[in-house]
């Protein structure tokens, strides 16, 4: 249904290089330790509520970078996995050849999609849904990154407004109407909006045309 473009692998090569060698920023500085922050930690409370609602046990951390959500701790020294109530989190990071995709109750995808070439967004979204048994939880950055690709371009290659991402999610969710999805969009490091939890089946079951 969806085909990946040649740019997908080219970008993956760039991110693999950056993970190994670091990257330049747009302010002229150079960063050696890269993509090791556990982005879902900032959303611990939201994830905890969703896990409790679905009684979820497992999660796939899609685009996990260099972090491991099974061991990383919150500021109070409690493990993230214990706080949110999950039993096992499977990391998957193709830029580091880390982990394998595994169908889980929940799929987490935080600060990943903005790094994907625009043609390949539908393919990746479909991949997220196909690996979820209950819910897909996404945060996407809607602003330019400080990081630069090795070719000098901005590392956030697909920057679009929140409503655009909402439309993408709604379209792909028609293929998986029983899967819930939650969307967060960030327009800055401290400026995050929650666009709610949705499920296409609820719209199909409604007696209203206007949704």
Question: What positions do the PLM features span?
Answer:
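Conserved N-terminal segment of class I S-adenosyl-L-methionine
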Residues: 1-106, 122-125, 131, 142, ...
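Residue-level micro-sites within transmembrane alpha helices that shape
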Residues: 60, 113-114
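A short His-aromatic
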Residues: 115-116, 120
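Hydrophobic beta-strand segment of the Class I
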Residues: 107-108, 112
């Amino acid at each position: 249904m969806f085909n990946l473009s040649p740019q997908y692998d080219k970008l993956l090569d760039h991110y693999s290089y950056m993970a190994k060698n670091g990257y330049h920023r747009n302010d002229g500085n150079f960063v050696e330790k890269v993509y090791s922050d556990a982005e879902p930690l900032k959303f611990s409370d939201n994830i905890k509520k969703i896990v409790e609602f679905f009684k979820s046990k497992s999660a796939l951390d899609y685009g996990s970078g260099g972090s491991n959500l099974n061991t990383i701790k919150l500021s109070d020294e409690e493990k993230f996995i214990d706080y949110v109530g999950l039993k096992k989190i499977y990391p998957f990071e193709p830029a580091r050849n880390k982990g394998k995709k595994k169908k889980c109750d929940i799929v987490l995808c935080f600060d990943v999609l903005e790094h994907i070439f625009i043609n390949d967004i539908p393919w990746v979204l479909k991949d997220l849904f196909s690996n979820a048994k209950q819910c897909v939880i996404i945060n996407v950055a809607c602003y330019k990154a400080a990081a630069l690709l090795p070719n000098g371009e901005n590392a956030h290659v697909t920057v679009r407004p929140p409503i655009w991402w909402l439309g993408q999610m709604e379209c792909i969710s028609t293929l998986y109407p029983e899967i819930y999805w939650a969307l967060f969009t960030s327009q800055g490091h401290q400026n995050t909006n929650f666009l709610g939890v949705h499920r296409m089946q609820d719209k199909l079951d409604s007696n209203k045309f206007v949704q």
